[in-house]
Amino acid sequence: MTKIAFTGGGTVGHVSVNLSLIPTALSQGYEVLYIGSKNGIEREMIESQLPEIKYYPISSGKLRRYISLENAKDVFKVLKGILDARKVLKKEKPDLLFSKGGFVSVPVVIAAKSLNIPTIIHESDLTPGLANKIALKFAKKIYTTFEETLNYLPKEKADFIGATIREDLKNGNAHNGYQLTGFNENKKVLLVMGGSLGSKKLNSIIRENLDALLQQYQVIHLTGKGLKDAQVKKSGYIQYEFVKEDLTDLLAITDTVISRAGSNAIYEFLTLRIPMLLVPLGLDQSRGDQIDNANHFADKGYAKTIDEEQLTAQILLQELNKMEQERTRIINNMKSYEQSYTKEALFDKMIKDALN
């Protein structure tokens, strides 16, 4: 029996593709294990959503692009992570490794190379992240969500495969969504998502302008972990820190979304034809990957975008109004998008590329 190791973590986006592919692997009779960090969001997601597979926690350090004393400590964490991962891989003897990226993946990919285990890596963003740039040196192939990403990668290793969307995305139940929220079916629903880490600035603007927003929408507010404000209670407004199983039902009742611009999330909105106002992570918090993603979607006519540095209540409300006026055009643009690979076709390609 072929055995597959998966890795990737740090954010929801570094786990969601794995969550899409693992059930396909299991349904076809493959044995699966997951290697991630000890305390990252990937551990919570994998152990809660796929309790039947083995999860191996390893030491991991953060990859920083700036000078910091923490870098010295993290070198030792990464080295320990390589040893941890090598021990797991020697024990489990997987036939291949699929890596979704994030800093935890680098020691796993290096360990796999040292044991001659073929590795396929996946890049969701328009420009490759630092972890995948390092991992690519030890991998057999890299798959990309954006076709334009091929311009940044060696031709012999890179393949464009498009977005990989999880199986249950289109199975959301609107009736369940309205029951969960207690919302009125005859009024539009606005979903606000600040990403897995949340956005304090976006959260603050939403709360300060709830009265204006509630004139037009009912609001589902995903605040991020630890950022829910229990004191804010209004009819037509509901807060969650983070939603797992019920998210598809909430998406089924969503008319418009305000969101960060992580690749996996925005491709899910695109697949569901939900017009989106994107507020990407700024350069002070990231390498600019979400800015590239957001601008690409805006150029395609799928979304509107606001730089977080320019985000004010007035601009947010203005852009929402503009988007509602252009709603039909945006949805028609979205209809031109077609998924490149089904999960099953992508999985078959992964097996073929790794083992041939």
Curated annotation (Swiss-Prot):
The keyword Cell cycle applies. Its EC number is 2.4.1.227. It catalyses: Mur2Ac(oyl-L-Ala-gamma-D-Glu-L-Lys-D-Ala-D-Ala)-di-trans,octa-cis-undecaprenyl diphosphate + UDP-N-acetyl-alpha-D-glucosamine = beta-D-GlcNAc-(1->4)-Mur2Ac(oyl-L-Ala-gamma-D-Glu-L-Lys-D-Ala-D-Ala)-di-trans,octa-cis-undecaprenyl diphosphate + UDP + H(+). GO terms for molecular function: undecaprenyldiphospho-muramoylpentapeptide beta-N-acetylglucosaminyltransferase activity. GO terms for biological process: carbohydrate metabolic process; cell division; cell wall organization; lipid glycosylation; peptidoglycan biosynthetic process; regulation of cell shape. It is a peripheral membrane protein. The keyword Chloroplast does not apply. CDD domains: GT28_MurG. It is found in: Cell membrane. Pathway: Cell wall biogenesis; peptidoglycan biosynthesis. UDP-N-acetyl-alpha-D-glucosamine binds at R166, S196, Q290. GO terms for cellular component: plasma membrane. Keywords: Cell cycle, Cell division, Cell membrane, Cell shape, Cell wall biogenesis/degradation, Glycosyltransferase, Membrane, Peptidoglycan synthesis, Transferase. It holds the Pfam family Glyco_transf_28. Belongs to the glycosyltransferase 28 family. MurG subfamily. NCBIfam families: PRK12446.1 (NF009102). Cell wall formation. Catalyzes the transfer of a GlcNAc subunit on undecaprenyl-pyrophosphoryl-MurNAc-pentapeptide (lipid intermediate I) to form undecaprenyl-pyrophosphoryl-MurNAc-(pentapeptide)GlcNAc (lipid intermediate II). This is UDP-N-acetylglucosamine--N-acetylmuramyl-(pentapeptide) pyrophosphoryl-undecaprenol N-acetylglucosamine transferase. It comes from Staphylococcus aureus (strain MRSA252).
